[in-house]
């Protein structure tokens, strides 16, 4: 969800939604295993309540990474990137009105959050090839985050919307 408040962009993603997205990706992976060996692996690839502490740790790491990228590129994250009331919240101080870039930023934050959970899960379940794949996806999304943040800042500066 994207909201605009007092010259700020606030991007919010529910942890439940992010976990659901990660769970969907895991279920797709479990289906490919069924196709290979005929056994049902759905139970092996389910985020359980007992996994929630690991999920929160993974999401804290994602928040730290997002904050660092935004600080380096735009030097303007007001209330940082945090987990607040079961939501991931990214607050950016100054922005421009280019909704395409803001929407892209929102999508990337969601992607990074889901991929962070998947990466943590792959490491925990000892699937190094999957962990490596998720690490590559994570890195690609971080690069995307950086380029969109830079573009958002460029357009803002050229349109004099930072003032």
How should each PLM-predicted stretch be described?
Residues 111-123:
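Short, hydrophobic/amphipathic alpha-helical patches that form generic packing surfaces
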Residues 101-111:
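Structural motif
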Residues 126-136:
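Short conserved catalytic/interaction loops centered on acidic-Pro-aromatic/His motifs
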Residues 1-98, 102, 140, 144-163:
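Conserved short "hinge" loops at termini or chain/domain junctions
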